[in-house]
Amino acid sequence: SLFSLIKAGAKFLGKNLLKQGACYAACKASKQC
């Protein structure tokens, strides 16, 4: 259904944002941006 598709998309986007956030934080911490 459309709803489950939206939920799957939101979960995927959330994981990507978390990954990007973690990479950004590590980059800031090591000052290698």
UniProtKB/Swiss-Prot annotation:
It is found in: Secreted. InterPro entries: Antimicrobial_frog_2 (IPR012521). The keyword Secreted applies. It comes from the Eukaryota. Disulfide bonds join 27-33. Expressed by the skin glands. Its main location: secreted. One of its GO terms (cellular component) is extracellular region. The keyword Kinase does not apply. Has a non-hemolytic activity. Has a broad spectrum of activity against both Gram-positive and Gram-negative bacteria, fungi and protozoa. Monomer. Belongs to the frog skin active peptide (FSAP) family. Brevinin subfamily. This is Gaegurin-1. It comes from Glandirana rugosa (Japanese wrinkled frog).
